[in-house]
Regions:
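Zinc-coordinating Cys/His ligand positions in small cysteine/histidine-rich zinc-finger domains
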Residues: 170, 174
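Oxidoreductase and adenylate-handling cofactor-binding alpha/beta cores
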Residues: 178-179
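Active-site-proximal cap/lid insertion segments
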Residues: 5-9, 17-116, 120-167
């Protein structure tokens, strides 16, 4: 709706999504605030990641945190099947966000805003999604710290350039873009 209005001045629009954070409720076996996700037969759930096993060189504090902080890491007793269902649910939550982002992209298309629009997409952190038998954040595993930063410049909707550098996710985008 906001993007359909005529704007006389440049504008800054922020769309912030709760998901896939609701995976925390799933791990705690709590209801989701926006409706639960039906879990299919285990045969239809994704497999385990190649790095599912805990690393023998992981710091002892990581395992201690996992075992002794059940409210944050209720997955310590998860079976491989539990992890597969967790991964299925996580991916469905990501798809929910994808659909919401699609609405914004479609509105930019409908209103011919690409010539004067910068779109920035990022996240604060990833989730272990079963790698190293880990969920949540708090550990410096690749799955958690390697998050997307996608930027489209005016008139460059499908430029398609990928850079391998790791970018800090603590960037103040508003101040950076306005500079």
């Amino acid at each position: 709706e906001y993007l359909s209005r005529k704007h006389k001045k440049p504008f800054f629009l922020v769309a912030s999504y709760d998901n896939p954070h609701n995976i925390c409720e799933y791990a705690r076996r709590q209801n989701f605030p926006y409706g639960n996700i039906d879990i299919p037969d285990i045969r239809d759930c994704p497999g385990l990641p190649a790095n599912f096993a805990k690393n023998p060189y992981d710091a002892d504090v990581i395992e201690s945190e996992r075992i002794n902080n059940y409210n944050v890491y209720p997955t310590a007793g998860f079976t491989p099947e539990d992890w597969r269902m967790y991964r299925y649910t996580y991916y469905r939550l990501v798809e929910k966000v994808d659909r919401e982002i699609r609405k914004i992209i479609d509105a930019i298309d409908r209103n011919n805003l690409w010539e004067n629009t910068v779109v920035i997409f990022s996240s604060d952190h990833g989730d272990g999604i079963g790698a190293h038998r880990w969920n949540q954040k708090s550990a410096l595993y690749e799955e958690i710290i390697n998050i997307p930063l996608i930027v489209t410049l005016p008139g460059k909707k499908n430029a398609g350039k990928v850079l391998p550098q790791l970018i800090s996710n603590g960037v103040d985008f508003f101040a950076s873009v306005c500079d």
